[in-house]
Regions:
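Short acidic-hydrophobic surface loop/beta-edge motif
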Residues: 9, 99, 109, 164-166
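Conserved small-residue
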Residues: 26-95, 101, 108, 112-115, ...
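Sequence context surrounding c-type heme c attachment/ligation sites in exported
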Residues: 18-26, 30, 117-328
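Generic hydrophobic alpha-helical membrane-segment signal
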Residues: 4, 36, 241-243
Length: 328
């Protein structure tokens, strides 16, 4: 919960009436919200990342929210995302990919489940809030685990399993043993050539619904002279606007390419390169299509792909990839 610093200004209004003097005092509260702290402190509430009750997940006014056109699948968990930049600093565009962040930037992502997708008034359960903080040119990762009362989240390095039950949009009750990753797990996916890096907010992934234009308008990003030169990663669910191939490649990029690319965790284990911009003939998708299918069709711990972040098959995602592989 954000701490509000309240300054009380007392205005003395003096009125003279005959020989009597009446003095009225008016208290006017002026509130200032403290800036977020770019450190991994023990409790999430200490970082000033949210204002109001912590469980509301209302971002600090010093931040900006963003969404991704094709997000990572994490056992149907919802995600709340925002970025905090240090005062007076901006992002710097680098092609269509990840922008350059100034030191003391914070990337915040909270994971939660609505108890009933058809009745949001039933509330939600927040599981974890992940942070990436840039300090002295290097990104550090931290994961805050939420308590049952939803009043605080505590910095943890170890993995944890959190049982969750929710009702999906079809009215079906779904039980999930949500896996909170360890700090080492986080680094596994976020590391490339032994350097921790952000994954989500690439320019091509936020270039829709005027998000990128709003960043330009708000002076939160520099280096874009013509927004039309920034490409857009396809929305894997939008079959009206994008081809099966483009949607499948986008899904593989977001869910698999962090490890399956040069310098990634699986670089020395396989020739697969799932980055969207990689030419098809250089991806090894055709040669490995049988293996790709076998790793996605059923969930087997330590065998299924993605290796981390899921505990069962993403039915809709698998159907997309299976349909795509059948065309090859």
């Amino acid at each position: 919960m954000n701490k509000l610093t309240t300054l009380t200004l007392s205005l003395l209004l003096c009125f003279s009436c005959s020989k009597n003097e009446d003095v009225d005092t008016i208290d006017i509260p002026v509130t200032t919200t403290p800036r977020p702290i770019a450190q991994l402190l023990p409790n999430l509430s200490q970082l000033n990342l949210f204002e109001g009750p912590l469980k509301d997940l209302t971002p600090s006014p010093y931040s900006f929210t963003y969404t991704l056109n094709t997000p990572l699948f994490t056992d149907y968990a919802h995600k709340s995302r925002f970025i905090v930049l240090p005062e007076g600093e901006t992002l710097t565009a680098v092609g269509n990919g990840m922008p350059e962040f100034p030191d003391n930037s914070i990337i915040v992502k909270s994971f939660y489940y609505n108890f009933d997708e058809n009745d949001l008034s039933q509330g939600r359960k927040i599981i974890e809030t992940r942070l990436l903080i840039k300090q002295n040119g290097t990104w550090i990762a931290g994961d805050y685990h939420w308590n049952e009362a939803q009043t605080e989240a505590v910095l943890e390095n170890n993995a944890a399993t959190v049982p969750v039950s929710f009702i999906d949009k079809n009215g079906t009750t779904v039980a999930v043993n949500y896996q909170i990753p360890s700090n080492l797990d986080c680094i596994t996916c976020h590391s490339n050539n032994d350097q921790v890096k952000p994954l989500g907010p690439k320019l091509r992934s936020i270039n829709y619904n005027n998000q990128l234009q709003n960043l330009i308008n708000n002076n939160q990003i520099t280096g874009i002279s013509n927004i039309s030169t920034i490409t857009t990663l396809p929305n894997w669910e939008d079959d009206a606007s994008y081809s099966l191939q483009d949607r499948a490649r986008a899904y593989l990029d977001v869910n698999c390419a962090s490890c399956h690319q040069p310098g990634g965790y699986c670089d020395v284990q396989t020739t697969l390169d799932f980055r969207y911009e990689t030419l098809f003939e250089n991806t090894s998708i055709l040669e490995k299509k049988s293996e790709i299918n076998s790793r996605m069709v059923n969930y087997q711990e330590l065998f299924s792909m993605p290796l981390l972040g899921t505990t069962f098959v993403h039915t809709e995602g698998y159907f997309l990839i299976k349909s795509y592989l059948n065309t090859l």
